[in-house]
Amino acid sequence: MILVLDVGNTNIVLGVYDDRELISVWRLSTDSKRTADEYGVQVIDLFLQSKLKPEDITGSIISSVVPTIMYSLEHMIIKYFQVSPIIVGPGVKTGINVKYDNPREVGADRIVNAVAAHEIYNRSLIIIDFGTATTFCAVTSAGDYLGGAICPGIKISSSALFEMAAKLPRVEIIRPQNIIGKNTVSSMQSGIVYGYIGQVDYIVKKMKMEMMDLGEEEPLVIATGGLAKLINEGTKSIDIIDSVLTLTGLRLIYEKNKE
C-alpha cells in the first residue's frame, strides 16, 4: 500500500492506495506550525480507525504548494511509516512536457492533475481545480502542458467582500435560485457564484479557441476540487468532475518513479 498526500493552502488530502484501488481518503487542516509528531499522531489514529496497519505502507508521495509545511510532513512519514516519500518537483518523472517559460514555476498540484487527466483521457484537456486558488490548465493530446490561468478561489472572493466592505456580511457560498437578489445576502451569493460561473465559461471558451488554433481537437474539460459540483450546477462548460484526480495523479507519478 502507498500513502499519497496532496498539500494545499487550506487542506491536506491523504489517500491510501492498495495497488490501484483507493481504499481511504482523509482531509486535515494545513497548519505549518504543527510538528511531525502532531501530524503523525493524527494520521496514525486515522489509520487505526479505518482498520489499516501503518506497517503495511511500503511507499509514499507528496505534492505540496506550501513549502513551510514540508519538513514536518516528510519527517512524519519517515518516523511513523519508515519510508522516505517522493516529493513532486524538479527531477521527478511525470511524462508531462512543461511548456511554461519557467517550468519550475508551475505548482506541483497542477502537474499532478495534468498527469492524471492525460493518463486517463489521452486527449486535449482543460483541467479546472477549484481550490484556495482556482487554476485552469491546458494540456495537449501529446501531453504538453501549455500553461493556463490562476484566479482567486471562490472562498477568497467571498472573504474579500466581507473583510473589505464594512456593511457586507459573511455569507454561505450557495447558488441562489435567481440571479437577481432581493436582499444583501442573496445579492452577494448571486454575485459570487454566478460571477464565478461566468468566469469559468469565459476562460474555458477562450482557452478552447487558443488550443484549437494550435491544431488541437476541442478539449475535454475536467474539474476537480471541493466546489466543482457547485459551479457545475450552473454551467455547461464542464464535461467531467473527478473528485480524486489529484490523488490519482500522485499514484501514477509514484509508479513512474518507484525503484
UniProtKB/Swiss-Prot annotation:
Substrate binds at Y100, G107, A108, D109, R110, T184. It comes from the Bacteria. One of its GO terms (biological process) is coenzyme A biosynthetic process. K(+) binds at D129. ATP binds at D6, V7, G8, N9, T10, N11, I12, V13, T132. Homodimer. This is Type III pantothenate kinase. It comes from Clostridium kluyveri (strain ATCC 8527 / DSM 555 / NBRC 12016 / NCIMB 10680 / K1). The lineage of its organism: Bacteria, Bacillati, Bacillota, Clostridia, Eubacteriales. The gene is coaX.
